[in-house]
Design a protein with these regions (language model features):
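Conserved short acidic donor-positioning loop in nucleotide-sugar-dependent glycosyltransferases
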Residues: 1
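Catalytic-site signature of metal-activated, phosphate-bearing donor transferases
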Residues: 5-12, 18, 22, 29-192
Length: 194
């Protein structure tokens, strides 16, 4: 069962109309808690709310590296549902009115380097499944240029170099994840043609 399927099962089980969806690696700050409580005491004008996340990795608050604009829809009316994908599921936003909260969730996405690498491995499996039918043939472009551009995106364009060594590590591992995705798609294509 994918994370989206798990969440879609859990949402209607809620006894209240509003649900705050949290992943195990997310923490509600006292400021965010106050904002949500205050919001729920008034008539709700929206169907769901974006919440920005402040990520931490290797003991450091990450200010750049592509993680600075990270936001997720987490406070939802129980009529909302997630799309059915294997990785990075999102609330289906068609015909719903979405707001944005001011305060952030704390996001401790990776406990350590081994955890980051294990998660990238798992995400690349799911991502390969999601992209398998969209990628007719894996080419030199997929295996070499897409990972290279992912590194450039995180390290240069999204200012990962300002996060120092940790920014370099994040950018490198994100590029590695793209490489793994396409190697796994290639593997599936080879075995499907046998």
């Amino acid at each position: 069962m994918s994370p989206a399927d798990q969440k879609n099962w859990a949402i209607p089980q809620a006894t209240h109309d509003w649900v705050l969806i949290l992943d195990a690696d997310e923490r509600v700050t006292p400021e965010l808690k106050k904002e949500i409580i205050s919001l729920l005491q008034k008539p709700m004008e929206k169907d769901a709310y974006w919440i920005s996340r402040q990520s931490f990795f290797m003991g450091k608050k990450i200010r750049f590296s592509g993680w600075q604009d990270d936001a997720v829809i987490r406070l939802i009316h129980k009529k909302c549902r997630y799309n059915s994908v294997q990785v990075h599921e999102e609330i289906m936003t068609k015909n719903i009115n979405i707001g944005r909260l001011k305060n952030k969730l704390e996001h401790y996405t990776y406990k350590n380097l081994d955890h980051f690498l294990a998660k990238i491995q798992r995400y690349s499996d799911w991502s390969a499944q999601d992209h398998f039918n969209k990628t007719p043939k894996v080419t030199f472009y997929h295996l070499y240029f897409k990972p290279f551009f992912r590194f450039i995106k995180h390290y240069i364009i999204q200012l990962g170099f300002l996060d120092g060594k940790v920014g370099f590590i994040i950018s490198t591992i994100m590029a590695w994840g793209v490489f793994l995705r396409y190697v796994k798609i290639q593997e599936k294509q080879i075995f499907n043609n046998l």
